[in-house]
Amino acid sequence: MKLFIDTTQNYCNLALVNDKNQIVDSYQELTNNNMTDIVIEKIQTLLAKNKVNKSKVKAIYLLTGPGSFTGCRVGFIIAMTWASVYKVKLYIMNSLLFQTKKGTGISIIDAKSNKKFIAIYEKYNEKFSPSILPNFDVENIIKKYNNLNKYEDYMNVDFFEKLIEHLEHFQQVENPDTVEPLYLKEPIQ
């Protein structure tokens, strides 16, 4: 069994995926800034509801950001702890790539303060690395890559369809100590 965790945006997205890469069950909730209070409880509920013991989870799939600083941190700490304690495989993908269709497109996420996170991909290859830029600069980049579809702020995105679409493109982490969330900006002080 695989456990998918995404806490990078305004939603807590969790899923159990079987060995045939089919979603067994999923959970999604708008968090209202209470991410740290609900994620562990919701994972426990999802596992219990499906009669899955923690030891049956053989891999964790995690979105690493960018997005909410706290959200990125919460999912990251849970995934890293689980991978270390239960000695399971860890797979990661950034939330900008995850938002694209088949790993191709201009991916944008609002970073607040008149800035946006942006990255550009073609067939899962980075053409423009994940960055945080002023809105004006983002518009200029969009014009340069106008042949690609634009995906913004997870509008009309079904997280669980995306999970199955991208599952084989998550990157396995060999050494969890070398992984960090993809923040791209400093936390608000």
What are these regions (language model features)?
Residues 1-20, 37, 91-189:
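Oxyanion-binding and handling regions
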Residues 12-13, 17-128:
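Nucleotide and nucleotide-moiety/phosphate-recognizing core
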